[in-house]
């Protein structure tokens, strides 16, 4: 069994495509069930954020599983396979693990080094675990990715600026609203989830004068407003139906609801700007961080209104990180990947070693029974001493080769040593499977038609070509 990753992100697709493939919290369990019902998939985890959707699946056949995941994404998004392949990327086996470690470290984020991705991976893993969709392979992969991400953030300065999508958006907004930035101004936060909480925290640090939290359920909005009040900021909680009235008071609006359909409409915005008492010259900056987008496109055409969406924020210089910090993070990812892969290879050879020792124990017991039949008068103390001696001899003979094969198997390409051990000692597949957990078994995948270059996969199968680049340098297709 190996891990297959199929993803679409801000690096390979424009916002309209990301909106189509976006997976909501409601969608995730349904799609996970569909993945598990597929012929070639035994484990599944879906990572979905405001700028990426990635499906991690443990598969027994690369081509078949790739076709199944691709068809599921096409059906979910409404995109045909031709359109989807232009924006999708594929990683397999070691390359899939490397990619997840980089994502968890913030190296693949729109804002390099942001920490929110760790929580999003944790959410994806918890959701998969709750559906019993994560077996040994995904448990170990996800847990190791979270550990790698934490280590990168604690040992490098990649997040020293505390940057996030929210901070970049609000920093841009501060420069638009006028002198003094956000200090003393009024902000509306739509949505009381993690992005809403992050927005309130950043607005508070920026010296905002007043925060209005708007949410479908007022109780959750009130909880977030209480957080703002606890930090000395005047705050109010409103239901979503009261959004136009709240907008009439706002200098800045931040929205990220994950809703299907516009939350901030042209009609509501026009009505808010026309409210008595609002200065016609007063700018309104709307930060649309939702995927799908929360703001109707026509809103950006209104006089005095600036809409900052994910596409415009992606071009912001503040989204970068210092080269030295990014290099240090990549070094950690590479080291952790090597350790993880060594552990995985060792786990693959362990059942073979166990089967060999079991085979030796069976031979010893058979020979002792033969001894009993030939020397029935042997008393118990003598028989016990003979048994101990034979077992010691066998253990000493097996110790060096089994320790050495574990060492060799943990190195890249080491799977051949386990195969050699099975061949030399005539260990049948059944005898190895008998001492292995079902999730420990390594599946045989025919990779003869697959060329893995720089972590990317290219091949001759037409289903494969729908989703991968034919660029031999391993660059994702942007066509």
From Swiss-Prot:
Lineage top rank: taxon: Bacteria
HAMAP family xref list: Glu_tRNA_reductase
EC number: 1.2.1.70
Gene3D superfamilies associated with the record: Glutamyl-tRNA reductase, N-terminal domain, NAD(P)-binding Rossmann-like Domain
Keywords: NADP, Oxidoreductase, Porphyrin biosynthesis
Function field: Catalyzes the NADPH-dependent reduction of glutamyl-tRNA(Glu) to glutamate 1-semialdehyde (GSA).
Species of provenance: Rhodococcus jostii (strain RHA1)
Record comment regarding domains: Possesses an unusual extended V-shaped dimeric structure with each monomer consisting of three distinct domains arranged along a curved 'spinal' alpha-helix. The N-terminal catalytic domain specifically recognizes the glutamate moiety of the substrate. The second domain is the NADPH-binding domain, and the third C-terminal domain is responsible for dimerization.
Catalytic reactions on record: (S)-4-amino-5-oxopentanoate + tRNA(Glu) + NADP(+) = L-glutamyl-tRNA(Glu) + NADPH + H(+)
Residue numbers marked as site, Important for activity: 99
Quaternary structure and interacting proteins, as annotated: Homodimer.
Additional facts recorded: During catalysis, the active site Cys acts as a nucleophile attacking the alpha-carbonyl group of tRNA-bound glutamate with the formation of a thioester intermediate between enzyme and glutamate, and the concomitant release of tRNA(Glu). The thioester intermediate is finally reduced by direct hydride transfer from NADPH, to form the product GSA.
Family: Belongs to the glutamyl-tRNA reductase family.
Active site location: 50
Protein name: Glutamyl-tRNA reductase
């Amino acid at each position: 069994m190996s891990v297959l990753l199929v993803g679409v992100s801000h690096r390979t697709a424009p916002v309209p495509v990301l909106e189509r493939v976006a997976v909501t919290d409601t969608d995730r369990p349904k799609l996970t069930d569909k993945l598990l019902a597929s012929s070639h998939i035994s484990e599944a985890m879906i990572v979905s954020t405001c700028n990426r959707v990635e499906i991690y699946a443990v598969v027994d056949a690369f081509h078949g599983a790739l076709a199944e995941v691709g068809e599921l994404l096409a059906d979910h998004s409404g995109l045909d396979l031709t359109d989807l392949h232009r924006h999708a990327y594929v990683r397999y086996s070691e390359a899939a693990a490397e990619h997840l470690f980089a994502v968890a470290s913030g190296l693949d984020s729109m804002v390099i080094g942001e920490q929110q991705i760790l929580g999003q991976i944790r959410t994806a893993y918890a959701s998969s675990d709750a559906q019993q969709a994560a077996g040994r392979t995904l448990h170990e992969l996800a847990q190791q990715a979270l550990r790698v991400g934490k280590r990168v953030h604690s040992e490098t300065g990649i997040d020293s600026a505390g940057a996030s999508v929210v901070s970049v958006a609000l920093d841009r907004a501060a420069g638009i609203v006028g002198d003094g930035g956000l200090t003393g101004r009024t902000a509306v936060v739509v949505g009381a989830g993690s992005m809403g909480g992050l927005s309130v925290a950043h607005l508070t640090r920026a010296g905002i004068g007043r925060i209005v939290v708007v949410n479908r359920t007022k109780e959750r909005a009130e909880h977030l407003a209480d957080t703002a009040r606890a930090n000395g900021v005047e705050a109010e909680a409103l239901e979503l139906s009261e959004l136009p009235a709240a907008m009439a008071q706002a200098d800045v609006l931040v929205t990220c609801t994950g809703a299907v359909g516009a939350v901030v409409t042209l009609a509501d915005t026009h009505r808010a700007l026309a409210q008595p008492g609002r200065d016609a010259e007063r700018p309104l900056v709307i930060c649309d961080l939702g995927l799908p987008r929360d703001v109707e496109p026509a809103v950006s055409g209104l006089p005095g209104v600036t809409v900052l969406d994910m596409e415009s924020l992606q071009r912001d210089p503040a989204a970068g990180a210092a080269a030295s910090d990014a290099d240090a993070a990549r070094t950690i990812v590479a080291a952790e990947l090597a350790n993880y892969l060594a552990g995985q290879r060792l786990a693959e050879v362990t059942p073979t070693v166990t089967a060999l020792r079991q085979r030796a124990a069976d031979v010893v017991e058979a020979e002792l029974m033969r001894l009993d039949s030939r020397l029935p008068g042997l008393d118990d103390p003598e028989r016990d001493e003979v048994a101990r001696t034979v077992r010691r001899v066998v253990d000493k003979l097996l110790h060096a080769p089994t320790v050495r094969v574990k060492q060799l198997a943990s190195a890249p390409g080491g799977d051949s040593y386990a195969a050699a051990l099975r061949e030399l000692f005539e260990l049948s597949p059944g005898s190895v499977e008998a001492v292995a957990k079902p999730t420990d078994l390594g599946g045989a995948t025919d990779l003869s038609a697959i060329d893995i270059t720089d972590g990317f996969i290219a091949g001759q199968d037409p289903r494969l070509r729908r989703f991968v680049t034919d660029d031999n340098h391993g660059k994702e297709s942007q066509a």
